[in-house]
Amino acid sequence: MNGGDMNQQQQQQQQQHQQQQQQWLAMQQYQQQWMAMQYPAAAMAMQQQMMYGQQYMPYYQQHQQQQKMQQSPTQIQSSSEDNKTIWIGDLQQWMDESYLHSCFSQAGEVISVKIIRNKQTGQSERYGFVEFNTHAAAEKVLQSYNGTMMPNTEQPFRLNWAGFSTGEKRAETGSDFSIFVGDLASDVTDTMLRDTFASRYPSLKGAKVVVDANTGHSKGYGFVRFGDESERSRAMTEMNGVYCSSRAMRIGVATPKKPSAHEQYSSQAVILSGGYASNGAATHGSQSDGDSSNTTIFVGGLDSEVTDEELRQSFNQFGEVVSVKIPAGKGCGFVQFSDRSSAQEAIQKLSGAIIGKQAVRLSWGRSPANKQMRTDSGSQWNGGYNGRQNYGGYGYGASQNQDSGMYATGAAYGASSNRYGNHQQPVS
């Protein structure tokens, strides 16, 4: 490249740089004016932050440098090309849809903005979703805004891909067979999980790492979808214990349940994840986690050939087993420990493990000795759950008695505005 070409290229870069500065300065001035009109109290409190003069570096350039000096608050997950929605967290109570719309309107066409609010109080849950016209626009915002300072505040944007866009939902037509994948390392992304399976199973349709809507971080489990049932069955045995990143994966079943008239969903995935929701509280098996005297575990999906003694041996490693009961023909069992801590450890570590020839599902049960045993194994997990997260028809349910601020009540994100909030989201 000769000197003339280099000078021309430098001039073009300078022009682009100046245009970018002008665009972001115009956006900042617009946001300041809008903020002063909509939120006079907040504008007064942050008057100095709003007074960006021409002699200062524009908003975008200034905070791009700050972003390089500090770690991004959220590890950005990968997403499919049809996902046009981003998650935003750490919102203040005064921030509403209009404020968020003004933050992003200059960067791309905003289709909709929704802040998730508590169903009872109406207060913001401090996170929401922004949908753009295209995937490219959403990706541009995610890459350029994440970690930069929010207008008229002293806090950075916390952004990530919305975990469950409409494009990631299971198609109504065609076969779809999924597995639950637990014990994932915190750095595992959708792409990493998919690549771990793709080389062995040609029918692989997709992979999803479930992300906490409040923190934007992985919950340590996900789902992998196949187009071929035999490959799904092979993966259940072949991939159990295989490493993805720094940890061995724990594979379990993830069988969809068609919703009833009340939109009840299967909570098999939450049972596979140890019966624990995102804040660590156990979900309802047949007894509330609040009952500290309960030491009985319900074992679902039990191989019909497993004996009482074999079941006992599987749980002995976690503590003293008081009793074991396998009701005839029910495909389930009950294991009672002498203390609750042993039962908790068993639920956490043995959920999804293979006992006999099948992966078991564990949750809190009722003691058969007290005649509180469920007579139908399905009733242990077929209840409806609020605050669900869904992936391709396979669900992770948060128990209804949880603090609504501790889990993602609206993470099953829909394309239209009536698909947000604390309501259960239908999955095709």
From Swiss-Prot:
Keywords: mRNA processing, Nucleus, Repeat, RNA-binding, Stress response. InterPro entries: Nucleotide-bd_a/b_plait_sf, RBD_domain_sf, RBM42_RBP45_47-like, RRM_dom. GO terms for cellular component: cytoplasmic stress granule; cytosol; nucleus. CDD domains: RRM1_SECp43_like, RRM2_SECp43_like. GO terms for biological process: cellular response to heat; mRNA processing. Residues 84-164, 177-256, 295-367 form the RRM domain. One of its GO terms (molecular function) is mRNA binding. Disulfide bonds: none annotated. SUPFAM superfamilies: RNA-binding domain, RBD (SSF54928). PROSITE patterns: RRM. Constitutively expressed in leaves, roots, and stems. Pfam families: RRM_1. It is found in: Nucleus; Cytoplasmic granule. Interacts with the poly(A) tail of mRNA in nucleus. Belongs to the polyadenylate-binding RBP47 family. Heterogeneous nuclear ribonucleoprotein (hnRNP)-protein binding the poly(A) tail of mRNA and probably involved in some steps of pre-mRNA maturation. PANTHER family: POLYADENYLATE-BINDING PROTEIN RBP47 (PTHR47640:SF66), TRNA SELENOCYSTEINE 1-ASSOCIATED PROTEIN 1-RELATED-RELATED (PTHR47640). This is Polyadenylate-binding protein RBP47. It comes from Nicotiana plumbaginifolia (Leadwort-leaved tobacco).
